[in-house]
Structures are given as structure tokens and as C-alpha cells.
């Protein structure tokens, strides 16, 4: 169901973000997954899915977000316990320019299949 008409000047953009973001809200027990992004006038709005990973309520606080954002808003102020209908919400972030530059880089992943030679 589409409830809004296209807005002149607003266009979809590629967010160039990893499939899972761990550096955005490291203090909260949740997973963060990028959904979509839209741009206009040098700014970008990024929609991210937040899902609880614990069996208790998680209260969301935009002050705990890590990165360089113009503003942020959550669709809901809290997440329910994992596995409940309330365990997921959407976070909307506004960034200047490309969104991938506003996020803290993900830590380098070690190759689990690497073979280490010993001496």
C-alpha cells in the first residue's frame, strides 16, 4: 500500500552500508540492519531495522547512538523481548552527504578459515 506521492527532489540512494551494523548502538542488545535510504539537498535519510536480542524490554535512547548524524528518531521508544511482535522497530537517521561516512567503521573481521603455519 502506497500512502504518499513522490516528493520532488527526494530520490532513493545507495547507502553503501554493511548488511549488519555493530558500531551504531554498541551499548544495546540488538541487531541493526539497513533497510533503505533517500537523499535530497545534500542530506540523506537512512532507515534501519532494530531488533532486540534479549528477553527483556529495551528502552531506546538516541543519545547512545555512535556516529556523526544530523538527527535521529525511532519509530517506537522501546523494543519488546526477542521473539515478540514488539521486538522490532525502525530508526531513521539524517546524515550530511553519503551515509556510509557518518557511521563508525565496522571492526575488521578475521578470516576464520585462514591457515596459520607454525615454525
Model-assigned labels for residue ranges:
Residues 55-58, 99-101:
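Short beta-strands and strand-coil junctions in structured, solvent-facing domains, enriched
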Residues 1-19:
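Surface-exposed beta-loop interaction hotspot
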Residues 48-55:
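Asparagine-centered strand-capping/turn motif at beta-strand->loop junctions
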Residues 35-40:
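Short, solvent-exposed beta-strand/turn "edge" segments of beta-rich domains on protein surfaces
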Residues 102, 106-119:
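Extended, charge-rich intrinsically disordered regulatory tails
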